[in-house]
From Swiss-Prot:
Coiled coil: none
Protein's recorded name: tRNA 5-methylaminomethyl-2-thiouridine biosynthesis bifunctional protein MnmC
Gene3D superfamilies: D-Amino Acid Oxidase, subunit A, domain 2 (3.30.9.10), FAD/NAD(P)-binding domain (3.50.50.60), Vaccinia Virus protein VP39 (3.40.50.150)
Essential cofactor(s): FAD
Subcellular location: Cytoplasm
Species of the source: Dichelobacter nodosus (strain VCS1703A)
Length: 618
């Protein structure tokens, strides 16, 4: 779904929302107002200064608007907090401001570097979650959509709130009891809150959900404002999708596997300030080493969890590709064949999901415009070159549990991530059978003349290389097959398909690549903590008789053991978002995905399905 852009009128060069008939901030003293109401109202400078080394702080807001409060908070954090501390910002907006309008609003503001980082990755108006890195130590999770629905989807541990937005008299639909319940659910004990409004309904609703509310001196012409402290945490029902609390530890994190799942995970953890050791088996190259790959997905007919996850991953990937060095992305349209009887429905569905410059349908093809072909070896090299990452060419055959963590060789790690694709020997038995091997062979051809710069994906993908006279065709798809030997039959089928696609060209077979991928049995990745199967089977066994029986039970996990695997043929599409989700789980940061989707991606889902289907012996 696409959100509606805010209707902005400039009055004396200051933004005015014509729908709500209100200003966004004090025209003359916007930053001073933000300092008084939100920064001082939450005692943020003192709290930022008091953070421990490597501390993390989460700040959430109910109305992003022009971004003034978020940029201001980030600037104060960078000035006050320890150099190893990190800030997570969350802000929602039902009516985002168009980028060019936002730049006009900002033209006289300070904090140039923060603004440029925002502009570089500012999302289109697609609803949902969009994670932006404003600074190596500051992340902003933008939630486009209704405030209540956005925060219902959110999973975070919030330390302070900016209760902002147009006044209750102007925007009553935002200031609803459901929003205040979500604020309480997400708040840490002793979380603080500040707001410009002193309306009775706001005071009453904050008090009702557990906040101790006080009137304070307001800013400029406003006599009062409110500050509050969360003193009565609500009881929250436990779920099998809950994941372990983060463990504070400055020791390196081990990532086993250096394919696209392992590399993106290591990179994301390194970007969040963690030291990472990556282990890879030199005798078993990963499928991600294929010379070229294309990220694509076909939006389905219905709004399934898979479509939601793939759509979120696509938007996240497009932001990541903007930041990649030259030579990694060969930008060209990605075309997918569309059946003629589906054209009208596809076009209507597309209009609800994308701007025309992002995706469109032309000549019976669905085009995506913001990505292209990826040089995967270069991409992996770039990701693993981060200064916080060290690589070890070493096969890991065993993980040994210790009181203080996991032993790998002579090193003990508090946290370990398994990104070992189809090589499952390090996984518990209950999770080993949840993935299957998929053999894929791609063939490369030389053409006698250049072709157009367009990727075409149907039964096979046709990817022109940068010189446009060499073509990647593939790949084959053979389930439960881990044979790495090249097959002439696959080459012959690819050659036939290439001739049919380019009948006017002569082709010459040059080389082939064989990779073995791991695909989950439901075609979605496994991302999250590694569960102790017996705890799930024991505590949720009643679901074998009735899935609707309420169960409020925690489950047990192997201590600080995680996995990112089962990406299948969608690795380049989903790996970046999967890595962000996993890093957030490990570090206690806000999840960049709707929490309802956890039921579709955490490894525990397969054990729960076993119970419901009566397959406990499988």
């Amino acid at each position: 779904m696409l959100q509606t852009y805010a209707p902005i009128d400039f009055r004396n060069n200051d933004p005015y929302n014509t729908d709500f008939e209100d200003i966004y901030y004090n025209p003359a003293l916007g930053f001073a107002e933000s300092d008084h109401v939100f920064i001082a109202g939450n005692h943020l400078r003192e709290r930022f200064s008091a953070l421990p080394e490597y501390g993390r702080f989460t700040l959430a807001e109910t109305g992003f608007g022009t971004g003034l409060n978020m940029i201001n908070a980030a600037a104060h954090f960078l000035e006050c907090a320890p150099k190893t501390a990190a800030l997570n910002l969350i802000s929602c907006e039902a009516y985002p401001i168009e980028l060019e309008t936002l730049k006009r609003i900002h033209h006289h503001w300070h904090h140039h570097e923060l603004r440029i980082a925002l502009y570089q990755n500012y999302p289109h108006r697609a609803s949902g979650m969009h994670l932006i890195r404003l600074h190596p130590r500051v992340c902003l999770l933008l939630l486009w959509g209704d405030a209540t629905r956005c925060y219902q989807a959110c999973m975070a541990r919030v330390n302070a709130w900016f209760l902002d937005g147009f006044a209750p008299s102007k925007n009553p639909q935002m200031w609803q009891p459901e929003l205040f319940r979500e604020i309480a659910r997400l708040s840490q004990p002793n979380a603080t809150l500040a707001t410009f409004t002193v309306a009775a309904q706001v005071r009453e609703q904050l008090t009702a959900v557990g906040f101790n509310v006080h009137k304070q001196t307001g800013f400029a012409q406003k006599r009062h404002m409110l500050s509050a402290v969360y003193e009565r945490p609500l009881s929250v029902e436990k779920s099998w999708t809950d994941y372990p609390a983060p463990k504070f530890d400055t020791r390196p994190i081990a990532v086993i596997g250096a394919g696209i799942a392992g590399a993106t995970t290591a990179y994301e953890l390194a970007q969040r300030g963690k030291v990472v050791h990556v282990y890879h088996d030199p005798e078993n190259p990963c499928a991600s080493a294929v010379p070229v790959a294309v990220p694509f997905f076909l939006p389905g007919k219905t709004d399934t969890p898979m479509r939601q996850f793939h759509l979120a991953a696509w938007h996240d990937l497009c932001r990541e590709l903007k930041c990649c060095p030259q030579g990694i992305v060969d930008r060209m349209p990605i075309a997918l064949a569309v059946a003629e009887e589906s054209l009208a429905r596809r076009k209507e569905s597309l209009a609800d999901l994308f701007e025309p410059e992002q995706a469109d349908i032309e000549a019976k093809k669905l085009y995506f415009y913001q990505a292209g072909a990826l040089d995967t070896p270069r991409l992996l090299t770039y990701l693993l070159a981060d200064k916080n990452i060290t690589q070890y060419a070493q096969k890991i055959a065993q993980l040994t549990p210790q009181a203080e963590g996991w032993r790998i060789g002579e090193q003990i790690y508090a946290r370990v991530v398994l990104a070992t694709s189809w090589q499952e020997q390090l996984l518990p038995n209950a999770l080993q059978k949840r993935m299957r091997t998929v053999r894929g062979q791609a063939t490369f051809f030389a053409l006698n003349a250049p072709v157009a710069g367009e990727i075409f994906c149907a039964e096979r993908s046709f990817i022109p290389l940068p010189d446009r006279v060499h073509m990647h065709v593939g790949s084959s798809y053979s389930v439960n097959d881990c044979d790495r030997m090249r097959r002439t039959q696959d080459d012959a089928e690819h050659a036939e398909a290439c001739r049919a696609r380019f009948p006017q060209h002569a082709i010459q077979l040059e080389r082939a690549f064989v990779g073995i991928r791991a695909a989950s049995r439901d075609y979605l990745p496994l991302i999250g903590a590694v569960v102790r199967a017996e705890s799930v089977y024991q505590r949720y066994q009643k679901w074998s008789k009735d899935r609707n029986i309420p169960i409020n039970e925690e489950i047990d996990y192997y201590p600080q053991l995680y996995m990112h695997s089962g990406l299948g043929s969608k690795g380049t599409l989903t790996a970046f978002l999967g890595a962000k989700i996993l890093a957030a789980m490990m570090l206690g940061d806000p999840l960049p995905i709707d929490r309802k989707l956890l039921t579709s991606i955490v490894p525990t889902r397969f054990l729960v399905k076993d119970i419901i289907r009566g397959h406990l012996n499988n």
